[in-house]
Amino acid sequence: MSEANSTLNEFLKQIPKIELHCHLLGTIRKETMKDLARKNGSRTTDAEIDAFYVRGEKPVGVLHIFRELENHILQAPDDLRRIAYEYLEDASRQQVRHAEFFWNPTGTLAATTLSYSALQNAILVGMNEAETDFGITSLLIPSIDREASASAGLEMVELMCTHRHPDVVGIGMDYIEVNNPPEKFSDAYALAKKSGLKTTAHAGEFGTSWKNVETAMNVLGVDRLDHAYTVLDNSALVSRCIDQGILITVVPTNSYYLRTLSADSWAQEHPIRRMARAGLKIHPNTDDPAFHLVDPIKCQRMMVEAFGYSIDDLKSFMLNGLEGSWLENTTKSNLSKQWSVEFNEQRQKIF
């Protein structure tokens, strides 16, 4: 590592961070997956699990891993408590102070006899334990599996409303976007908004049309957007996002662009390079850190080294994340002031 890179890395280790786009099942440690597979008598072998943690130059995504977890490995509420606790432990070591993370309940509910309330409560226990042990706060975002039926999405929101908890603040929507447009789950989003839940959605992730981003805004009425890279294909929609100040959570290690762009052109052609420069409010995230082979520090470093953003930009991204988070407004305001002071102090100390 060069001296400049070493200096940047030291700085990134110290600055406060927030994570808003991370999937719980995408955080599971390799040894934890092996432990759970053995404990639960899963068909999944150690060799198969080892292969999950190898990422090729043209990655195919992680959904097959999530399906293996849902269908064959996860068998007890405590499995999810452990995964949540360990994710937050790992994040806190990277100076992540607050995390809002996705959990897809539909697959596990379909594959087991476990109840929604038992699973949600187990994750909340893990979150509380992590806050006690590491000081990291967190909020849970149950997320619609867009490969499931519209009725399954609505049922998920109904379960959230039945088992309402203040740390379960809103809904998301993820998994395969192709042939599963946002409007498929309009009823689920309408109920969420009527019930006072926050909303976000993956859209424009897999090279799909900017119309999915527009639909997420117009039909679903989302409070923030995840990925949304193809918004750049419609200048009027870009202007609208800027005017609304809507936060877009982006992922430097996104599989689609690693797979479809050449290694030589990836950093120059990736939409993330253009998004903030176009005036969009973005915040970088790890998505599935265990399988993307990334962590919050590396994620921030990629924004500088791959996409050419500056230290000033990193501060803007940090503040964007706080502003777009689902923390209480007073908390956001206080943290923005505190974190800005910390950021500036570390900058003066290291650079």
Mark where each language-model region is.
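Metal-cofactor-binding active-site regions of metalloenzymes
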Residues: 2-197, 205-211, 219, 224, ...
